[in-house]
Amino acid sequence: VRGVPDSVKRLTLADESLIFDAVAQQTVDLVRSYISADGTGRVAIIAPDDMVKPLRRHVYEQLRETLSAKEFDRLDAQSSWDEQVTVCSTQMVKGLEYDAVMVVQPGIIEENAPSRIVAAADLYVAMTRPTQRLLIVRTNADEKLLKL
């Protein structure tokens, strides 16, 4: 995030049962702010490996319910290499930039890494991908795992 006022936001939730809905709603807000129908704008939701698939389903269900059918169909039809909305692990975003990035449960990302050096590299990659907005979404328990 390059000198944009209010570019880093944090959302801390009471428990894990709230994560999926919160991430889905925050994604809708980011899509409305950063994604254009002309194909410009990119948003990444970076999560622990075991959360990626179920989180992607939940996010896309929320997008389907919230966006116009035309806009949802346009986003849903995009190939994985050119998606405007990506739900992925840290490994998938290396070397890429996004207008907005949401990092979900960074403490778990760190905890699941095979070593401390890999954990540090993964979190560095995740948190340096956005050009305009970084949003960290986590639970109170995750915050105890890793202070940011």
Model-derived regions: residue spans:
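Core RecA-like ATPase module of SF1/SF2 helicases and allied nucleic-acid translocases
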Residues: 2, 16-28, 32-135, 140-148
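ASCE P-loop NTPase motor cores of helicases and related translocases
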Residues: 4-9, 13
